[in-house]
């Protein structure tokens, strides 16, 4: 599902799509597809980690150790060499900026490719999880009906 929007754009089946910025970045920069991201009106969403309280790795502290490692400044900056998702820590941005061009191709600056870059956050919409929980079924049905009529 995540690969479909950039594929539809690259194949000329659609002229506009929404999707994960990392997929669009990979298509445009990684694969050279003739597409471009538009950040005006982007939808900003949050991601969360959840630990199972009183699980075997919670009680012995291993779950928190792994979480701390996965979300360390260095690890988050390192992941940006491969995908343009914004790191969860602002401290990671400094590492990325200091190492630009940061992308694995050695020529692409990553900070401007991220949804949280200052020039990309001038007019974003914050995802409303409650709205989607309340309306997902109805909207999905309308979406499928609209697509069937194309």
Identify what each model region corresponds to.
Residues 3, 57-61, 130-137:
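Soluble non-cytosolic domains of exported or imported proteins
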Residues 13, 21, 28-31, 70-74, ...:
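Sec/Tat-exported extracytoplasmic proteins
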Residues 1-38:
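Ligand-binding pocket segment of bilobal, Venus flytrap-like solute-binding proteins
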Residues 6, 10, 18, 64-71, ...:
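Non-transmembrane alpha-helical segments in soluble domains
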Residues 32-53, 104:
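Periplasmic-binding protein-like
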Residues 52-120:
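Mature extracytoplasmic/periplasmic domains
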Residues 115-150:
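Conserved C-terminal helix/tail region of periplasmic/extracytoplasmic solute-binding proteins
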Residues 22-26, 42-44, 56-57, 74:
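Solvent-exposed loop/turn segments at secondary-structure junctions
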């Amino acid at each position: 599902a995540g690969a479909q929007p950039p594929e539809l754009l690259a194949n000329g089946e659609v002229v506009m799509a929404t999707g994960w910025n990392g997929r669009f970045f990979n298509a445009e920069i990684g694969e050279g597809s003739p597409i471009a991201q538009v950040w005006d009106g982007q939808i900003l969403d949050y991601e969360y980690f959840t630990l199972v309280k009183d699980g075997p790795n919670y009680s012995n502290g291993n779950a928190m150790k792994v979480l701390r490692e996965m979300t360390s400044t260095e690890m988050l900056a390192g992941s940006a060499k491969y995908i343009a998702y914004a790191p969860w820590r602002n401290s990671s941005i400094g590492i990325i900026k200091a190492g630009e061009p940061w992308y694995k191709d050695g020529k692409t600056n990553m900070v401007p490719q991220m949804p949280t870059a200052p020039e990309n956050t001038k007019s974003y919409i914050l995802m409303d999880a409650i709205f989607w929980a309340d309306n997902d079924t109805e909207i999905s049905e309308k979406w499928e009906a609209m697509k069937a009529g194309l």
